[in-house]
Amino acid sequence: YMAKRILVTGAGGFIGGFIVAEALKRGYETWAAVRRTTNREFLQDERIHFIELDFTDELALKATLAQAIADNGGKWDYVVHNLGATKAANYLDFERINYGYMRLLVDTLKALDAVPEVFLLMSSLSVMGVGDDEGYTPFKITDDPVPNTRYGMSKAKAENYLKMVPGFPYTIFRCTGVYGPHERDYFLMMKSIASGFDFSVGFRKQMLTFIYVKDLATAVINALEAGPKRRAYFI
């Protein structure tokens, strides 16, 4: 039995660390793509293989990936692209990072003949745009995305690129609000609610959805093992 090999980009992030942990738990040979500056506080397991990928340098990225593939007996079985910007100083950064970096990774894997069994893109519910604030009907996966933020637009553009690559083995997760250990923003919100503050944005009823980070990490690995679906899922 050969252990499955997985590459997780954005491994130093909140969600990335939990995806790495779940992959290790299942016995995968687990590669964490990081930058030189990435905080590795939650990537302490000595079984992790680190690979420094510089998405701002196309040639260096290709060389690093090619070297890793050559040195380690072949391509990755699974790639989880969890790298993304949710906050950006300049709105152009959203497209450069969320669309541009993913496209570069896909194109490079193709060029190296290293397309995995499954490429899972961590996208976002924000590709859908504004919800129905009259009847509060939930989004259906068949609804057309109408993103209304630069962030949502950049994620939608990344999704569309995957769909256009002939036969590319992708699955897309449109993640909702993710909470859990090491996450700051929702934690502060929950603390204030717990201490008796109720707050909402605006004056309308709000329907928000959340997923616990460890459940999300489990779902990510399950989705890889289920094979490429060439479609998106809300999670």
What residue spans do the PLM features occupy?
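Catalytic helix-loop patch of NAD(P)-dependent Rossmann-fold dehydrogenases
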Residues: 132-177, 198-206
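SDR active-site strand-loop-helix element
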Residues: 9, 33, 79-83, 119-125, ...
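N-terminal Rossmann-fold cofactor-binding loop
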Residues: 33-38, 55
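Conserved Rossmann-fold NAD(P)-dependent oxidoreductase catalytic core, especially the SDR/UDP-sugar
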Residues: 103-150, 171
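NAD(P)H-binding glycine-rich loop region in Rossmannoid oxidoreductase-like domains
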Residues: 53-104, 130
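N-terminal Rossmann NAD(P)H-binding glycine-rich loop of SDR-like oxidoreductase domains
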Residues: 6-26
